């Protein structure tokens, strides 16, 4: 879904940072997120993703730089940001002793939605997210997937222009994950921008744009296709029955950046673009010397997981 014609970006951050004592949790982050876009925010634990979300929501004051969210300054216009954004935390943050309906009505009141407007919005969202039959159940008794759905409904009660979702499908089974994503696409089609953190790389492929955080820095961003393109012609697949021995041998081949195991297939990463047919001989020689002869050698299309692992490996090596 493309942005509304002439619409300003929903997030504009320039040099944003947050320091806790001697720790730079987020450093010099500059970012734009377009209207009506699903933006995937990736990175390992401790990379600064949640800290970034809290700053953009106005929940945590930056110690450097500045940002505007839906047109409002994050340091001085918290109330305006709250009225136009929703936030769903990574952990279940609703009231377990209240029913599903009571939780929704409570958050509706927090956002200034009362009476018939709240009832109408609840009917609308509960039908879409399949919570209708659970209205009277205590929230603490819901399954993980249903808790996530209720949290999402509460974040949407006031029809926000932008919603921050911190790991919205964590701990949810694949079928429930698919339902959540179907709903997120429908939200985006209806005009809501989404800022999503996730550890699931297949989910990142569903986003219109993604950014990768490492050690508090945004080190790459773009469309999933453009991000994968950074590894184009640099990933080669190898069949190996003795996968562990072959992996160790291939890591010593000049030009090889890393090797990972996927069953009887090895994914061989090169520092520069290569032709699989050209490098096959050097790979076979190294593996045969180690007593782990190879089967087929073939080019592989890179994935976001490949890129994620490459960035993480470089970050670890740089420390």
Spans of features found by a protein language model:
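Catalytic Walker B motif of ABC-type/P-loop ATPase nucleotide-binding domains
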Residues: 163-166
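Short, charged/small-residue-rich alpha-helical element at the C-terminal edge
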Residues: 232-314
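Conserved catalytic motifs of ABC-family nucleotide-binding domains
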Residues: 159
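Conserved ABC ATPase "signature" region
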Residues: 105, 109, 114-134
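Hydrophobic anchor residue at the start of the ABC signature
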Residues: 152
């Amino acid at each position: 879904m493309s942005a509304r014609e002439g619409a300003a970006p929903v997030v504009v951050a320039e040099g944003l940072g947050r320091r806790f004592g001697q720790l730079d949790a987020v450093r010099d982050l500059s970012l734009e997120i377009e209207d009506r876009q699903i933006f995937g925010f990736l990175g390992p634990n401790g990379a600064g993703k949640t800290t970034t979300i809290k700053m953009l929501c106005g929940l945590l004051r930056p110690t450097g730089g500045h940002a505007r969210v839906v047109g409002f300054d994050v340091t001085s216009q918290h109330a305006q940001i709250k009225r136009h954004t929703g936030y769903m935390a990574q952990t279940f943050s609703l009231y377990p002793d209240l029913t599903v309906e009571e939780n929704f009505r409570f958050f509706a009141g927090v956002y200034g939605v009362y009476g018939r407007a709240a009832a109408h919005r609840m009917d609308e969202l509960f039908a879409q997210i399949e919570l209708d039959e659970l209205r009277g159940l205590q929230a603490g008794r819901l399954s993980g997937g249903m808790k996530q759905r209720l949290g999402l409904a509460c974040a949407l009660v006031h029809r926000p222009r932008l919603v921050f979702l911190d790991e919205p499908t964590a701990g949810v089974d694949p079928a429930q994950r698919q339902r959540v994503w179907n709903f997120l696409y429908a939200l985006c089609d209806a005009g809501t921008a989404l800022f999503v953190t996730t550890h699931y790389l297949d989910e990142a492929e569903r986003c219109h744009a993604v950014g990768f955080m490492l050690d508090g820095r945004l080190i790459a961003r773009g469309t999933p296709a453009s991000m994968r393109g950074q590894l184009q012609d640099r990933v080669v697949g190898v069949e190996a029955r003795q996968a562990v021995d072959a992996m160790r041998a291939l890591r010593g081949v000049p030009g090889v950046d890393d090797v990972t195991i996927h069953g009887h297939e090895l994914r061989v990463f090169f520092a520069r673009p290569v032709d699989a047919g050209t490098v096959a001989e050097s790979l076979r020689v190294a593996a045969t010397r180690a007593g782990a002869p190879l089967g087929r050698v073939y080019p592989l299309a890179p994935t976001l997981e490949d890129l994620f692992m490459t960035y993480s490996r470089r970050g670890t090596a740089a420390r």
